[in-house]
């Protein structure tokens, strides 16, 4: 379902000078033969970004997932890029969230960085996230203009690909704009804000239970704290585990 979008994302990263980086040992890929599911992840080094991670989960007709978060360099105060795409094939249900995730909720910060996303929300009114903001804490890492898509196969094959491409283009444009001007938030503060994002997200990640059900607790704990949110407070507390040792039976 999401392989064309995954290739589009990777292609756009390569065009911007991105090169693949090493994923922590044992976290590059994991499989559950019993559930016929697998997850594969990539880490990218991209000019202007501290890290850019991508993950793709394939559980057949049960579930398809594409997730990515981009962390700009500390000397750039632009929002993080976050996307979560989920397809439940048996129910023919799509859930997609695409957002520029703000470091702070200050009005002047939002005005500086979110004009492009505002335009996209107007361009794709069917993806307006206004009604879904009740699902998220509006004061923590979500913007008022996130793109939210929930629907069936028609949206998955028509609305989503066009919005996905426009979203990526918009974020690259924002990055180019920020590369040409000074950041208004000091680099040391941006670093602390990105660390706070990892801590907040690791504590609340709704996908952790999903990963655990497919790939076991030990592997999923490592994945959460060593790959998804490595700056979280528990990053060094999870012992190494063999990916095959803790699969659910």
From Swiss-Prot:
Task: Give an example GO molecular function.
Answer: cobalt ion binding
Does the entry feature the keyword Ubl conjugation, yes or no?
A: no
Q: Which UniProt keywords apply?
A: Oxidoreductase
InterPro entries from the entry?
DiHydbiliverdin_OxRdtase, Ferredoxin-dep_bilin_Rdtase
Q: Identify which top EC class this enzyme belongs to.
A: oxidoreductase
Query: What is the E.C. number?
Result: 1.3.7.2
Q: What PANTHER family does this protein map onto?
A: PHYTOCHROMOBILIN:FERREDOXIN OXIDOREDUCTASE, CHLOROPLASTIC (PTHR34557:SF1)
Q: What is this protein called?
A: 15,16-dihydrobiliverdin:ferredoxin oxidoreductase
| Upper classification of the organism | Bacteria, Bacillati, Cyanobacteriota, Cyanophyceae, Synechococcales
